[in-house]
């Protein structure tokens, strides 16, 4: 049974070709990715109890499969309007009855609205330690540009029980490589092998346009225009999710966003409300 779920997640999709393309396109340093992986791995080794990745993955899977509706929250400009509309029309119990997964800074809004967070998927640049501690599970990603943040969150990571480390380099005993590039699409590559036929996926605040939502970074007061690098990252995220569609095999809906691809189902906020 050792590493059964780790192997399941890592083998469910073949992401290496995507990774090579991304590294070449952005001129990323492979060695820095490995260095970040090793930093996070050493931090996880310092946990005072015996850290068992497989047990935490099993716990996450069991929690994830208890509910029919899965809400994945991105940091796009439609996030706040969408969440507030759902709260006003369907009430907080709607979110209480969903699996709520936040891409990085989207956790800020969910915490402000006192919405339970089942998991944050984060490279740590969009959340505070307070956001970190409010989630049931935290999936921390190590890459070449966040080594300083890994050190900043070191004690928080050590003291947090239900934590899963991810890397885009070769995996280790303590870290998993689920594929994915941005926090938003990495949520889907991470959960795709856990999905059940009766479940449905709702992507909220995932707009993939040239406006970046204010919740993408702590202390932002308003949305802002994406720079060329950010825009290219969002386009990759969109392409990766499109590529995942045949592997997801359950209904997936983008909520309250403009049509960006023929491969997705779209729901206005009113249409979303009518489903429930």
What do these predicted ranges mean?
Residues 1-70, 75-84, 220-223, 234-276:
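N-terminal donor/sugar-recognition subdomains of glycan-related enzymes
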Residues 62-67, 98-99, 105-198:
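Acidic/Gly/His-enriched mid-domain segments of enzyme catalytic cores or analogous surface patches
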Residues 70-71, 92-100:
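Short beta-strand/loop segments at the ligand-binding rim of alpha/beta enzyme cores
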Residues 72-77, 183-184, 198-215, 229, ...:
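Glycine-rich anion-binding loop/nest that anchors nucleotide
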Residues 74, 81-86, 111-114, 214-215:
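Short, glycine/acidic-enriched capping/hinge loops at junctions between secondary-structure elements
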Residues 85-94, 115-117, 154-157, 218-221, ...:
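Short, solvent-exposed amphipathic alpha-helical segments in soluble enzyme
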Residues 87-88, 147-150, 184-185, 228-239:
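Well-ordered, non-membrane alpha-helical segments in soluble/globular domains
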Residues 215-227:
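A solvent-exposed, charged loop/short amphipathic helix patch at secondary-structure junctions
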